């Protein structure tokens, strides 16, 4: 495929993912600063863009919270963006529900799920952790104690992700 055509396909995929995520998240706001929620997926995508990536990883970064936090489904994502993007989003979506138990139990289930994820999904998750860590540290120091401990445990299973992002995430995590 010609480089120009490939670039256009990549841009179309990213623009479509951004539009889908913006619609899906609608009026949602970030808990820690009240900004429109879409700023988080955009930040995650930009962090992923800073390291070796594929167009599907950027799309998944933009869509990573849609199944978890909106009415969007994996089937809709698969139909709109293809199986590669949908598979990445599936890996990035928490599998636990309140039915599974308290937060500690749920986060452990989600950690085990991510442990088996491909490197591309782990790279997007590292970007997600980095953006969330920065926001939570600044906006909710009390919750940072909980999130920071969870982040530290999660980093144990994300070693196959991008090494630059892994180092950044480790630097943000509590000692």
UniProtKB/Swiss-Prot annotation:
Keywords: Cell membrane, Membrane
GO molecular function: guanosine-3',5'-bis(diphosphate) 3'-diphosphatase activity
CDD domains membership: HDc (cd00077)
GO CC, alphabetical: plasma membrane
Subcellular location: Cell membrane
Matching PANTHER family: GUANOSINE-3',5'-BIS(DIPHOSPHATE) 3'-PYROPHOSPHOHYDROLASE MESH1 (PTHR46246:SF1)
UniProt keyword Cell membrane present: yes
SUPFAM superfamilies: HD-domain/PDEase-like
Domain HD as annotated: residue spans: 37-133
Pfam families with a match to the protein in the record: HD_4
InterPro entries attached to this UniProt entry: HD/PDEase_dom, HD_domain, MESH1
Descriptive protein name: Uncharacterized 19.2 kDa protein in cobO 3'region
